Amino acid sequence: MYLSIDVTSLPSISSSIYKNESSSTASTLSGKSIGRSEQYVSPDAEASSKYMLSKSPEDIGPSDSASNDPLTSFSIRSNAVKTNADAGVSMDSSVQSRPSSNVGCDQVDFSFNKGIKVNANLDSSISVSTNSRKEKSKNDHKSRKHYPRIEAESDSDDYVLDDSDSDDGKCKNCKYKRKYFALRMRMKQVAMQLIEDL
């Protein structure tokens, strides 16, 4: 498996120390505002929609006037996930999550300018050899002997036992040969009769 990651532009990290002096404290990164100043709802429809679109989806609650409107709620959520790829993505921290004391703390912002490119290639090959199996099957065919087929209706005198079945040709003209063929013919007739009856 081949995995390559293009990290030509790692996230640029900037650290800043701030103190919670007022609720309108903000630091900017790539033209975006990280902190938010407090806004108030006005009766104007345009100002109200701007207010709702500026809030994050988690901050919208029952007290907001447009939170129960499905279209406005969908618009707010879809606007919340839109980002500008050229300007970068900033990790936003809300004012409420900052400590209330005057103790300074570090704030770290991440900006991904080019992103991460991942290429994964999976190469596999399977080879199966069947040479030994073919040779074995050829040997099986060689070891099998083909005997003459005797039909039930045929004359047994026309068939002579093969030399390989006898002991050095001692039973070539055996006295039991005729009885053997007669018995075999009767057994075949019985078998054929059983097959027909079934």
From Swiss-Prot:
Sequence segments annotated as region (Disordered): 17-72, 127-167
Recorded superkingdom: Viruses
GO molecular function: ATP hydrolysis activity; magnesium ion binding; nucleotide binding; RNA binding
Binding residues for Mg(2+): 92
Residue numbers bearing the Phosphoserine modification: 67, 154, 156, 164, 166
GO process annotations (BP): viral genome replication
GO cellular component term of the entry, any: host cell cytoplasm
InterPro entries registered for this protein in UniProt: Rotavirus_A/C_NSP5 (IPR002512)
Residue ranges, compositional bias (Acidic residues): 153-166
Cellular compartments annotated: Host cytoplasm
Needed cofactors: Mg(2+)
Keyword entries, A-Z: Glycoprotein, Host cytoplasm, Magnesium, Metal-binding, Nucleotide-binding, Phosphoprotein, RNA-binding
Post-translational modification: O-glycosylated.
Compositionally biased intervals (Low complexity): 17-33
Family: Belongs to the rotavirus NSP5 family.
HAMAP family to which the protein is assigned, alphabetical: ROTA_NSP5 (MF_04092)
Subunit structure comment from the entry: Homodimer. Interacts with VP1. Interacts with VP2. Interacts with NSP2; this interaction leads to up-regulation of NSP5 hyperphosphorylation and formation of virus factories. Interacts with NSP6. Participates in the selective exclusion of host proteins from stress granules (SG) and P bodies (PB). Also participates in the sequestration of these remodeled organelles in viral factories.
Job description of the protein: Plays an essential role in the viral genome replication. Participates, together with NSP2, in the formation of viral factories (viroplasms), which are large inclusions in the host cytoplasm where replication intermediates are assembled and viral RNA replication takes place. Orchestrates the recruitment of viroplasmic proteins such as capsid proteins to these factories. Participates in the selective exclusion of host proteins from stress granules (SG) and P bodies (PB). Also participates in the sequestration of these remodeled organelles in viral factories.
Protein name, as recorded: Non-structural protein 5
Species per Swiss-Prot/TrEMBL record: Rotavirus A (strain RVA/Cow/United Kingdom/UK/1975/G6P7[5])
Species classification: Viruses, Riboviria, Orthornavirae, Duplornaviricota, Resentoviricetes
